[in-house]
Amino acid sequence: MKSHLWIEEKHGDFLGMAYKVEEVLFSGKSKFQSVDVVQTKGHGKMLLNDGLVMVTERDEFVYHDMIAHVPLFVHPSPKNVLIIGGGDGGVRGVSCVRAFFLQCERAVV
């Protein structure tokens, strides 16, 4: 069944984004927050925490590259890394041999 749901996110008084939801893939509440995974028309799968967009298939690389590359570039040989948060798994660097995740929110892993 097609969804008539739109996700709207406002940023200040003059800027916002709207996403057409094709299907709700998961919706639940955890100990810490609400967690939703939806299929959108233009951005693919989207993860929302408490109704706020965390990451989308279309542009996740922008988010993950920004938070991963700086620490990876300052270390001469990043083989073993600890990732705090990052339950979606997108931060793990290609150069890493072993990655350890510390994620308190089981619902987003």
Give residue spans per PLM region.
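N-terminal auxiliary segments of SAM/dcSAM-dependent transferases
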Residues: M1-M46
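Short strand-turn-strand beta-turns centered on an Asx-Gly dipeptide
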Residues: D50-G51
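The AdoMet/dcAdoMet-binding core of the Class I SAM-like
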Residues: M1-W6, K10, S30, H43, ...
